[in-house]
């Protein structure tokens, strides 16, 4: 991969250098000689090029790997069943059109236009809202610490699958209690009503006693689970080597990590729909209950699922888009990827609920008693269903391999985008030698040690705090509101449409522009307010209540990202010289080196005779594209 050298066009000194380069062999000579090199290029000879994707497939697979993750398998199907089956698709499609696609496209196009990571892209389009970039990276830093814990659990389960009998299929192990009952072998006449009430399944005891060794509460952190610590180390090692060479390594790894889960999902789908009772499970999954649409919580669940599953407001899409060629048709890519993501979620529901229907059929209980979401589905419900199948170790192996690959590319793309943001802020520091690789190593080591606290006996309580507060839907909605305000009103939706037209050759439908300006921020603000009004303190398993300081930690993690935006606005306005209108004028003016490089603009990579003639003003300076379209 190579990246072309750039000669930015601007006023003042930049214009002088451009005119001085018109010597023989310069960029604007009439002889058609090679373009001039910017003097800085020679001084920074040791600075590595930023790089690009080798081809479109690498970009598409990287984005697909990031957005298609565990939430598609363990969250969407359960939400669909819980919120009216097929009726849930109505609010889901509304949010898909009004929030999912517009914000997804906004972030991807912004990265492609600026060729910058998740922080510097906002600095270039509107310095006043650079805090958006910091907010996204704080959320991403939280995700990098806790999301990979799920991979550690999955690796531990996978390591226990290579046996003739799965260890969570039977009682009698050292971690089982006297209340352990194998329900598939249950003879009700041998148990009293009281003993059945206290009975627990071997799969539940394996999860709570063997894997988590869970304590009584967050107050009792307990000992480190060293086996899980080794699994976490393995996960971080794999993650590091997937991204240590940037797009050169990531672009190759995603050919496997983004496609393999589809093979596993197809196999599990075929197996699931052929099981007895599968049809009942699918019916519960899709049977429409239109009366549920009157419940506001159904609409909130649909909106938050869109934000969770599309990886928006994390800076990932901006970072991945920044490695695209300038003229890549990012609009077409975004529409295709959004449809692929939602389609995968829908199909995954058949694979999951067919198996849950089978489990309910085998146990003779309603599906409502076996349906789970989140870790409960991945590590309790589905493993329990697998024990009822012939060749159960094989199906368990395939399932946990699918989980690992689904989570792995989501994890390393998150780390890659955080690294991209840092490197783009300090390119002369980190694009030399092996400094970028050392930065990735440092972030991985720090995140690993921070994650160890979630692998203690009380670690599950901390994990739930991260999941419910640090990367909650409330934080994502808050960031989305400001993203839309910045692009739709401050930078200007029409100007951004000009930038997009310059990149892809045409203007997308006006609906997306109106979503940026009105619909998306309005909907997000409504859901955000609903979150605050209906807020209920987190309870683990709906039983354990956290101490006050536990909720305090959760809210600190949530506010650590959301406060970045208003704090940055206040600090920059205070530090900028001039009157308030002058300050706002400066802070809402895009960077002078932010240029359109296609047919509507001038390429900063190569300056030709025609370009120089077209852009030179009467006073000899080169025109800068800094006209404002602020809707204040």
Curated annotation (Swiss-Prot):
Reactions it catalyzes: 4-aminobutanoate(out) + chloride(out) + 2 Na(+)(out) = 4-aminobutanoate(in) + chloride(in) + 2 Na(+)(in); taurine(out) + chloride(out) + 2 Na(+)(out) = taurine(in) + chloride(in) + 2 Na(+)(in); beta-alanine(out) + chloride(out) + 2 Na(+)(out) = beta-alanine(in) + chloride(in) + 2 Na(+)(in); hypotaurine(out) + chloride(out) + 2 Na(+)(out) = hypotaurine(in) + chloride(in) + 2 Na(+)(in)
Regulation: GABA transport is inhibited by SNAP-5114.
CDD domains in UniProt: SLC6sbd_GAT3
Spans within the Extracellular topological domain: 152-225
Membrane protein topology class: Multi-pass membrane protein
MF term (GO), any: taurine:sodium symporter activity
Entry GO terms, CC: cell projection; GABA-ergic synapse; membrane; plasma membrane; postsynaptic membrane; presynaptic membrane
Alphabetical GO biological process terms: amino acid transport; gamma-aminobutyric acid reuptake; monocarboxylic acid transport; response to xenobiotic stimulus; sodium ion transmembrane transport
Record Pfam families: SNF
Membrane-spanning ranges: 59-79, 87-106, 131-151, 226-244, 253-270, 306-323, 335-356, 389-408, 438-456, 473-493, 514-533, 553-571
Major localisation: membrane
Keywords, comma-separated and alphabetical: Cell membrane, Glycoprotein, Membrane, Neurotransmitter transport, Phosphoprotein, Symport, Transmembrane, Transmembrane helix, Transport
Cell compartments where the protein resides: Cell membrane
Cytoplasmic compartment segments: 1-58, 572-632
Carbohydrate attachment residues: 187, 190, 198
Expressed in which tissues: Widespread distribution in the brain.
InterPro entries in the record: Na/ntran_symport (IPR000175), Na/ntran_symport_GABA_GAT3 (IPR002982), SNS_sf (IPR037272)
UniProt record similarity statement: Belongs to the sodium:neurotransmitter symporter (SNF) (TC 2.A.22) family. SLC6A11 subfamily.
Listed name of the protein: Sodium- and chloride-dependent GABA transporter 3
């Amino acid at each position: 991969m190579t990246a072309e050298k750039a000669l930015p066009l601007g006023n003042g000194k930049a214009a002088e250098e451009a005119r001085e380069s018109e010597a023989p062999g310069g960029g604007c000579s009439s002889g058609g000689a090679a373009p001039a090199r910017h003097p800085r290029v020679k001084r920074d000879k040791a600075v590595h090029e930023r790089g690009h994707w080798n081809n479109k497939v690498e970009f598409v697979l990287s984005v697909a790997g990031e957005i298609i993750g565990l939430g598609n398998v363990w969250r969407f199907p359960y939400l669909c069943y819980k919120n009216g089956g097929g009726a849930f698709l109505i609010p889901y499609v509304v949010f898909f059109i009004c929030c999912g696609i517009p914000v997804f496209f906004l972030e991807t196009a912004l990265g492609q236009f600026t060729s910058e990571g998740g922080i510097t892209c906002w600095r270039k389009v509107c310095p006043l809202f650079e805090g958006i970039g910091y907010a996204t990276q704080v959320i991403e830093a939280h995700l990098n610490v806790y999301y990979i814990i799920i991979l550690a659990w999955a690796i531990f389960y996978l390591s226990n699958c290579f046996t003739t009998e799965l260890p969570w299929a039977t009682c009698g192990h050292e971690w089982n209690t006297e209340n352990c009952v194998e329900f598939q072998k249950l003879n009700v006449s041998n148990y009293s009503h009281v003993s059945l009430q206290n009975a627990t399944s071997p799969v539940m005891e394996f999860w709570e006693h063997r894997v988590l060794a869970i304590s009584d509460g967050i107050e009792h952190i307990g000992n480190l689970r060293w086996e899980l610590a080794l699994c976490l180390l393995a996960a971080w090692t794999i993650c590091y080597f997937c991204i240590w060479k940037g797009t050169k390594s990531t672009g190759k790894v995603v050919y496997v990590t983004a496609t393999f889960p589809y093979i596993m999902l197809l196999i599990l789908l075929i197996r699931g729909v052929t099981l007895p009772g599968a049809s009942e499970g699918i019916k519960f999954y899709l049977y429409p209950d239109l009366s549920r649409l009157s419940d506001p919580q159904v609409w909130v669940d649909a909106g938050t699922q869109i934000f969770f599953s599309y990886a928006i407001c994390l800076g990932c899409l901006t970072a991945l888009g920044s490695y695209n060629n300038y003229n890549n048709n990012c609009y077409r890519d975004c529409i295709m990827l959004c449809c692929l993501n939602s389609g995968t979620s829908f199909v995954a529901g058949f694979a999951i609920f067919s198996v849950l229907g089978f489990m309910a059929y085998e146990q003779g209980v309603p599906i409502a008693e076996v349906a789970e979401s989140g870790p409960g589905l991945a590590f309790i419900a589905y493993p329990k269903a697998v024990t009822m199948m012939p060749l159960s170790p094989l199906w368990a192996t395939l399932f946990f391999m699918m989980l690992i690959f689904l989570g792995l590319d989501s994890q390393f793309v998150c780390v890659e985008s955080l690294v991209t943001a840092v490197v783009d802020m300090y390119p002369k520091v980190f694009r030399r030698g092996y400094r970028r690789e050392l930065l990735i190593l440092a972030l991985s080591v720090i995140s690993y040690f921070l994650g160890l606290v979630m692998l203690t006996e009380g670690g599950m309580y901390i994990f739930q705090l991260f999941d419910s507060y640090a990367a909650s839907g409330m934080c994502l909605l808050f960031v989305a509101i400001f993203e839309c305000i910045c692009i739709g009103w401050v930078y200007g939706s029409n100007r951004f449409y000009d930038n997009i037209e310059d990149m892809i050759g045409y203007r997308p439908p006006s609906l997306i522009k109106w979503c940026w300006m009105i619909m998306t921020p309005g909907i997000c603000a409504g859901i955000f307010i609903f979150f605050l009004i209906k807020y209920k303190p987190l309870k683990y398993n709906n039983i354990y209540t956290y101490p006050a300081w536990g909720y305090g930690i959760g809210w600190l993690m949530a506010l650590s990202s959301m406060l970045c935006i208003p704090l940055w606005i206040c600090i920059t306005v205070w530090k900028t010289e001039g009157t308030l209108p002058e300050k706002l004028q400066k802070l809402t003016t895009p960077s002078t080196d932010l240029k359109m490089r296609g047919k509507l603009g001038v390429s900063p990579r190569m300056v030709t005779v025609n370009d120089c003639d077209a852009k030179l003003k009467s006073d000899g300076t080169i025109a800068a594209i800094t006209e404002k379209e602020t809707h204040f």
